[in-house]
């Protein structure tokens, strides 16, 4: 078995914590960093530090931002009466790429998953309900993923939103079951937004 230095192993371990990065890729990334100049390697560390210091979640929609509220929440060209609920920030990016949605967003930061111990209190559902109480929202578009957890989350949200008298719609099924929005092409997301249906 190949032996690595402690500092090499430490960086491999840190890279391996990233989503989609296994040990082999972590080793390749670490070898790449070894070939970089000290200045380039330090620039990466500085970029990570700056991200952690400056970026936070918007207090309204929970998308990431450097200013609070975020530009998506302060954009006067967006429809305040329409809120799109997504699981993760990357889902906002996928929908924005499609250029088919001009309302507001609400990021839950997860989906209901009782087997993993994730219930309604672990998501940004209460904040969504507060927004519905305080604002003149006419429609909530549920854009959770089309997997078991995403469907369960959408059904739960439809139930708790119902007393507000707000129209609740769901993305059309142009998006394959079991897929994550971030991996779907723009045209498919656009079709799904345009073909949303009421729940």
UniProtKB/Swiss-Prot annotation:
State the superkingdom: Bacteria
Name the SMART domains on file.
TOPRIM
In terms of InterPro entries, this protein maps to: DNA_Rcmb_RecR, Rcmb_RecR, Rcmb_RecR_Znf, TOPRIM_dom, TOPRIM_RecR
- Renumbered zinc finger spans (C4-type): 58-73
Protein family per UniProt:
Belongs to the RecR family.
* One matching Pfam family: RecR_ZnF
Keyword Transmembrane helix included in the entry's annotation: no
A molecular function GO annotation: zinc ion binding
Q: Which HAMAP family does the entry mention?
A: RecR
Question: Which protein is depicted?
Answer: Recombination protein RecR
What organism, scientifically named, is this protein from? Syntrophotalea carbinolica (strain DSM 2380 / NBRC 103641 / GraBd1)
* Record keywords: DNA damage, DNA recombination, DNA repair, Metal-binding, Zinc, Zinc-finger
Q: Which residues form the Toprim domain?
A: 81-176
GO biological process terms, semicolon-separated: DNA recombination; DNA repair
Q: What does this protein do?
A: May play a role in DNA repair. It seems to be involved in an RecBC-independent recombinational process of DNA repair. It may act with RecF and RecO.
């Amino acid at each position: 078995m190949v032996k690595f230095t402690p500092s090499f192993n430490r960086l491999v371990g840190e890279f391996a914590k990233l989503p989609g990065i296994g040990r082999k890729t972590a080793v390749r990334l670490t070898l790449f960093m070894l070939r970089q100049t000290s200045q380039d390697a330090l620039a990466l560390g500085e970029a990570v530090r700056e991200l952690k210091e400056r970026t936070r979640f918007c207090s309204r929609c929970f998308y990431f931002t450097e200013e609070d509220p975020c530009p998506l929440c302060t954009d006067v060209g967006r429809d305040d009466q329409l809120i799109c609920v997504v699981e993760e920030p990357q889902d906002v990016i996928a929908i924005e790429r499609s250029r088919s949605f001009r309302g507001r967003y609400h990021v839950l930061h997860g989906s209901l998953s009782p087997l993993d111990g994730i219930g309604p209190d672990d998501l940004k559902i209460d904040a969504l309900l507060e927004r519905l109480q305080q604002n003149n929202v006419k429609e909530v578009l549920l854009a959770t993923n089309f997997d078991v957890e995403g469907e369960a989350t959408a059904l739960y949200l439809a139930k708790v939103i119902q007393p507000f008298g707000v129209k609740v719609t769901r993305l059309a099924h142009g998006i394959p079951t079991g897929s994550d929005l971030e991996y779907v092409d723009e045209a498919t997301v656009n079709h799904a937004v345009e073909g949303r249906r009421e729940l």
